[in-house]
Amino acid sequence: MKLKIKDQLPDTEIFQLVDGEPQKSKLSEIIGNGKVVLFGLPGAFTSTCSKLHLPGFVANADKIKAKGIEQIFCLSVNDPYVMNGWGEINNTTGKIKMLSDPYLLFTKAIGAEVDRNAKGMGIRSNRYLIVIENFTVVNIHVEKETKECGLT
């Protein structure tokens, strides 16, 4: 992971589904200013992501926001339709905004890409959590392995 505390986030293009259509925006336009959490994971519908990571954030979203976090974002390298559908299945509406990095622009800019070709998954994102305030990294946690979900 190249990203460090006090770094500005790379302002890459990210996708989200808006009114049923993919919308491309700069990350700064999506997360804005204020204090937010952005967590990244290898892929929608994958085992650890679906059984632990996303459900953990859904279950604890109110507690996280009670600590001064204004918004929570989930980012993966899947397309925006998949991220939206996965979010709907996991009841993220009003709790977590689902973001898509299909070209790995953000993922590569922060050094979070991992090769999962041997498992038929291609290049994916490592599992991480970033606390951001006014587009600056305040805290960051990165898992050593994508199957782990203890720090993030």
What are the functions of these language-model segments?
Residues M1-T152:
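Chalcogenol-based redox active-site neighborhoods
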